[in-house]
Amino acid sequence: MCGFVGFVGGTDNQSEVLTKMMDRIVHRGPDMGGQFIDGRVALGFRRLSILDLTEAGAQPMANEDGSVVIVFNGEIYNFQELRSELEAKGYKFHCGADTESLLHGYEEWGEAVLDRLRGMYAFVIWDKKKNKLFGARDIFGIKPLYYYPMADAGDGAPGVLFGSEIKSFLDYPHFHKAVNKKALRPYMTLQYSATEETFFEGVYKLPPAHYFTVDIPTGKMNIERYWDCDYSAVEKPFEEYVDELDEVVHESVEAHRIADVKVASFLSGGVDSSYIAACLMPDKTFSVGFDYKNFNETNYAKELSDKLGVENVRKMITADEFFGALDDIQYHMDEPQSNLSSVPLWFLAEMARKDVTVVLSGEGADELFGGYAYYEDTVPVRKYKKMVPLPIRRALGNLALHMPYFKGHNFLVKGAEIPEKSFLGQALVWPEREVDGVLKPEYNTGDGAFELAAPIYARVKGQPELVKKQYLDMNMWLPGDILLKADKMCMAHSLELRVPFLDRKVMEFAEHIPDRYRINENGNKQVLRHAANKSLPDEWATRPKVGFPVPIVYWLREQKWYDYVKEYFTAPWASEFFDTDELMHLLDLHFAGKGDFQRKIYTPLVFLVWYKRFFIDEDQSSVQAA
């Protein structure tokens, strides 16, 4: 695990600029740093040593003649198989790191090396002979990769910035920092940055399962998808699926435990993280809760750890710690992200790093195996579907979509089985119809959430309703929220997080499970729960999703935290983005106990915390430094 930065450009003092960019991400790799500069191409690397702890595994790493150079963040779990195949073809290896297998793999197979990789990765390769860059991101988007095309990179020629974190771009002299005015509208609905162009104007995320090439002389960038899900049900007995999944998960955990350092696991007490912990059997598990009333569920994690004979390390988070960390959290996130679980994850990673360098966690199981409650129909909707033929339900649902919002609107739309018009996934903070009333017109110009979802739904046209929902989450919610915060919060503390459910072999198995084995009258995630039951006590395999419940609904009714939020909502610069009177109205109603508006308050708050850190505090510190 590590972080990398780089650019193609003609700026003065290339090494000095590259060092400053690398210093921005030293948390991703505190063990070692390295540079490579060749003309206009500059690569920088910060290393967190996990495989081959010697300097032989350092990056940037070049092949024998120096014609191909790589910077790589992540882990390739099948690197030993690739190495054996490449050695048979005559390639020489000089270290035990997986980076070298990826490097020589590119030499042998070119861009097709991506079809052979099993792992989490983001990398950029400088191919001197072809005078091009080749960069890619893993199929799920576990590891981040950003880029910033420049028409003039400082020498009159086109160029590009690229790296693991956007903040590294701030130190490039020809980077223009500005808020992307189109990003705020979908964020208000979804709570995360859902557009390929980030909250920094002109900075883009490379989507999961995509690669790019950059022709150095012309600056032309080409982006292609190299992998996609293949949802096609394969009929076989339920018990056979259960047995096979248990084998697949155990094998994935075994592959994900490879390291030359200690490996532990996060544990919430829910079935996903519990299953991983039971397969891994680490020396330690780590859990967090909140020091407030009934918001501490770490007792479940402690109980399971005791049953497994594993030490459980726990921490209780206070309100002061929660709000005190928001500024640093949004800095490390790079973009606003108002998933409340980012904060407990921050403290969880901080705690775990005191003991270990690598942790395994249960992210991805809900998306692959149908674990979210919103994948299921409510009892009234199920009855409606049984009683009323689909053509009639479709007609009523489409009629409702063309009418002003009314009570029963969502019921009719959900019953119509048209998720393209009704389903956006986990986080629905501000309904799209309400965003217009709180955003200033200048920042209400971007695509809405359903417009962003449309091309994703188009790729699974004709698939069952459940598949469409899972596919949308796989392409929006999972990389945009779950995996991004997992990477950023853990790497902020120099901790590598691995996710065995999000494995190529696990996905190739999961995509063929019939829908009725995922969700049925017995509940959700059925195949996974029965597989987990082989390794867990009965009560754990059937436990509901736990996550990180946060008591912010109560904290916002305390004077101290009301005043904290009010200071942001009434700041002079806040009115550039929001109707701050409307925000204060919601805050006052919530404070008085006249409604629960915690998420509608927290989402704009997080944006303002992010904006202040990057566009006010950052600029002030730059002036002082000058």
Residue ranges and their predicted role:
Residues 1-4, 20, 157, 171, ...:
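Adenosyl-5′-phosphate
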Residues 1-333, 345, 349, 534, ...:
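Cysteine-centered catalytic environments shared across enzyme families
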Residues 71-72, 183, 244, 339-343, ...:
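A conserved catalytic-core signature of glycosyltransferases
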Residues 90-93, 335, 589-594:
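A short glycine/serine-rich beta->alpha loop
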Residues 120, 124, 337-349, 388-394, ...:
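Short, basic, helix/turn surface patches
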Residues 132-133, 143-144, 170, 367-371, ...:
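Short catalytic/ligand-binding loop motif for oxyanion handling, primarily in non-cytosolic enzymes
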Residues 327-331, 353, 375-377, 555-557:
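Short low-complexity, flexible loop/linker segments enriched in glycine and/or proline
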Residues 347-403, 464, 477, 483-506:
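Active-site adenylate/phosphate-handling loop in enzymes that bind or generate adenylated species
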